[in-house]
């Protein structure tokens, strides 16, 4: 499994390619092409990289809490897991981690971590540190 930081670094380096593309097109193609759109795309990609990092960090740490490798948090205790998922976890111990991870990612996939408030909400699922 890739670390959240490695996933972020890979996404961030792809953003650097957009920056280079902007520099090239603005210097060499400004008469026929408005390269400012590339800058907008770069900003969107960088925000997306941060969002992906927080999603991956929260998902991996929540799984670690579930496995007993991290302490439970107040918000983690309130995270809703459907009865059907918990039944699968109990009845299929060989796939319990995968089942739980899939459900976490399904629910977190609805969230966006693009503001300081939403990022703090995600971190509270995995840490009781005061934010």
Annotate each predicted stretch with a short phrase.
Residues 16, 50-51:
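Structural signal for well-ordered, non-membrane alpha-helices
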């Amino acid at each position: 499994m890739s670390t959240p930081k490695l996933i972020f670094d890979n996404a961030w380096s792809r953003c650097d390619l957009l920056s280079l593309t902007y520099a090239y097109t603005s210097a060499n193609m400004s008469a026929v092409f408005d390269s400012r759109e590339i800058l907008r795309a770069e900003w969107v990609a960088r925000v997306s990289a941060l969002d992906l990092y927080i999603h991956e960090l929260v998902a991996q740490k929540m799984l670690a809490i579930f496995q007993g490798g991290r302490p439970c948090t107040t918000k983690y205790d309130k995270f809703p897991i459907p009865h059907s998922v918990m039944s699968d976890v109990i009845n299929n111990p060989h796939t319990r981690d995968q089942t739980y991870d899939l459900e976490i990612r399904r629910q977190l996939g609805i969230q966006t971590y693009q503001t300081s408030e939403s990022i703090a909400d995600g971190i509270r699922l995995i840490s009781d540190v005061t934010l």
